[in-house]
Each structure stands twice: as C-alpha cells, then as structure tokens.
C-alpha cells in the first residue's frame, strides 16, 4: 500500500506534519509513505537527526517526492489547481489518478483539494458533486455529517446524494444495516427551511418508500438534537455543516478548559483521569479528518491547523479506508441504493 502525504500549504509547520509520517511509518510496516514537499522543507527534514537516521535506516519506508510549488490557503481553488500543476497538492492527486498511490492525505487548501479531486479523479457512478464527510461524537456514538465544507450551496438532489453516501459509509465502516438519516434544519416540521431543503425532504421521503432503500429517513433534525445521537447520518450543505463542525470544535475546547478549572479542587489523579476520558472523546484532533466522498479514490482532508497527532489520525484513517476496500464497498452500496 502506498499513501501520499502533502506537507505543504497548511497553517501547520511541514516538520510537524512530517513527524506524523515518521510516527506512522514506525508502526505501519506494510505501508510506503510518499511525502510531497518543496526542496527547502526536504532539506530541513534531513537536517533533523532523528528523521535523517530513520530515512537512512529504512529507505524503502518513506519516499520523498520533491515539488516546486505550493497552493496556499488563500489561493483561489480552481485557478490554483490549473496554474500550480507542480504543487504538492496537485501532484498528489495526479499520482492517485495514475494509480501510483492508494490514498492521499492533505491539510492544505480545502477548496483546492476538492476542486482538484473533482477535476483529476473520476466521480463514482450517479454522483454529481463530491462532499466532505466527517464524524462528530454524540451521546449514542459518532454521527456522520455530510457535507462539512465541500459545497457552500446545494440543490435538493445533491442533498439526496449526500444522504446516500453517508448511509453507505455507516453501513460499510460501522456495520449499521439501516442507518437513520436526518436533514439539519431550523425546525422538525416538513415545511421548515429553504425551498431546496423542503424539496430534499420530499425526495428522501419518496426514496424511503422504495422497497430496496437501505436508509431510514427520520425527517428534520434541529441543531440541539445533533449531539443527542438521534441520527447516524446528518445531511446538510457545506456552509452550514462547516459552521456546525467548527462551532462544535470551539465549544469542546472551551468546555474542556472550563472543566479543567473546575476540577482543581479534587486530586490530581482523579482530575487527570476524568480529563483524559473527555479529551479522548471530544477533542477534534482525535478524529481522522474528513473524507472527500463521491470520488473514485481515498482522499482525506485534515484540519488546516493539524498537530502531528491530528495528522497521524488522518493518515491512519486513510490506511484503514484502503485496507477495508472502502471505495469498492461504497460503489456497491450506491449501486443497490439507486436501483
């Protein structure tokens, strides 16, 4: 298995991201990691005694693929993909298209990654737009949220495709036979929301009546109900989904800080035990990035401010998707759902 890692274009240091590759390579002995970085970054990696020693001792475990350009966070997505063809991001996607990589992980420009994936990698049958799929913790386990930033605005038919992909993901990866699917809305009633959301509600309800449908559409879900775990798949447009995701990240950080302050009067051991349990469950860095769902390859988008641990989780998530043959399973699930 070959996994590509883009070290460039994020708000994190490339060396921080390479540390994740180094940690992954120590444990994932059946994986070859292809690192994409500019020559100055490659030089810094080789200047690090720990990294340099590992590269010399295990030359086949990490391949360094120098690139000459970088797509920055503030670059216009489509233009940058077309003009910066030798950037780390575009090079990684081209390697995926040529079947020289089994998966690709980047913490770079989200819009450029999605635009590049759409332009360079075939879409799955029946899917018109890719979407970012991420997971959030709830009272009853993780919920899949789709879309969390791929499409600022969506037609009703796109939301239906997102629902199908999210449900297929839950069946493939978590073994939920008939996932509960809900539309994120401002109220529970079917007449609430924008015209596209109302139309999507009707389309999903119609799909529910199909005898072969493998999802359980329960209707609209309000924001406060998301974390109660009332659904397995939460469907929304990318603008709203991204706001939900980043708000939940901020709230979790705030609550952990407040709790840490509140626990100052109990024993250090008790406090550390409680905080570790909550940190493992609610810290967004513990989750394996967002999947670009709808393309015919495994591409994972990590947080733009990823720590080495967050990037490591993204890398491990991509490896797991490839090992589980996620794309083939997703194709099969979507084929059944659209019959």
UniProtKB/Swiss-Prot annotation:
Keywords carried by this UniProt record: Cytoplasm, Lipid biosynthesis, Lipid metabolism, Phospholipid biosynthesis, Phospholipid metabolism, Transferase
GO cellular component: cytoplasm
Alphabetized Gene3D superfamilies for the sequence: Isopropylmalate Dehydrogenase
Any matching Pfam family: FA_synthesis
Documented EC number(s): 2.3.1.274
GO biological process: fatty acid biosynthetic process; phospholipid biosynthetic process
Superkingdom classification of source: Bacteria
Subcellular location: Cytoplasm
GO molecular function, one term: phosphate:acyl-[acyl carrier protein] acyltransferase activity
Catalytic activity: a fatty acyl-[ACP] + phosphate = an acyl phosphate + holo-[ACP]
Listed pathway(s): Lipid metabolism; phospholipid metabolism
Main enzyme class: transferase
Main location, first listed in the record: cytoplasm
Coiled coil: none
Family under the similarity heading: Belongs to the PlsX family.
HAMAP family documented for this protein: PlsX (MF_00019)
Subunit structure: Homodimer. Probably interacts with PlsY.
Role noted for this protein: Catalyzes the reversible formation of acyl-phosphate (acyl-PO(4)) from acyl-[acyl-carrier-protein] (acyl-ACP). This enzyme utilizes acyl-ACP as fatty acyl donor, but not acyl-CoA.
UniProt-recorded name of the protein: Phosphate acyltransferase
Species annotation: Protochlamydia amoebophila (strain UWE25)
Primary gene name: plsX
């Amino acid at each position: 298995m070959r996994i590509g890692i883009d070290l460039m274009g994020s708000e994190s240091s490339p060396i921080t991201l390479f540390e994740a590759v180094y940690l992954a390579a120590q444990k994932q002995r059946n994986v070859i990691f292809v690192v994409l970085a500019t020559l100055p970054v490659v030089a810094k990696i080789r200047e690090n005694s720990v990294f340099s020693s590992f590269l010399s001792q295990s030359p086949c475990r990490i391949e360094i693929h120098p690139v000459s350009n970088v797509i920055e966070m503030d670059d216009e997505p489509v233009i940058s993909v077309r003009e910066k063809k030798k950037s780390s991001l575009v090079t990684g996607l081209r390697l995926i298209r040529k079947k020289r990589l089994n998966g690709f992980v980047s913490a770079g420009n989200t819009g450029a990654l999605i635009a590049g994936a759409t332009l360079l990698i075939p879409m799955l049958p029946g899917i018109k737009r890719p979407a970012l799929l991420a997971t959030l913790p709830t009272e009853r386990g993780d919920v899949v949220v789709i879309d969390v930033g791929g499409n600022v605005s969506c037609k009703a038919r796109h939301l239906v495709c997102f629902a199908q992909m999210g449900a297929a993901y839950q069946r493939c990866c978590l073994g939920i036979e008939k996932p509960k699917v809900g539309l994120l809305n401002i109220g529970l009633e079917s007449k609430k929301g924008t015209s596209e959301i109302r139309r999507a509600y009707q389309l999903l309800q119609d799909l529910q009546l199909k005898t072969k449908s493998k999802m359980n559409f329960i209707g609209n879900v309000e924001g406060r109900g998301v974390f109660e775990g009332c659904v397995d798949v939460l469907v929304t447009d990318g603008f709203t989904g991204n706001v939900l995701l980043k708000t939940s990240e901020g709230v979790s950080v705030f609550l952990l800080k407040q709790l840490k302050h509140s626990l100052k009067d109990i024993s250090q051991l008790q406090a550390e035990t409680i905080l570790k349990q909550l940190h493992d469950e609610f810290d967004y860095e513990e989750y394996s990035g967002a999947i670009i769902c709808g393309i015919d390859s495994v591409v994972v988008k990590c947080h733009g401010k990823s720590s080495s641990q967050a990037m490591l989780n993204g890398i491990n998530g991509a490896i797991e998707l490839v090992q589980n043959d996620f794309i083939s399973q997703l194709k099969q699930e979507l084929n059944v759902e659209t019959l």
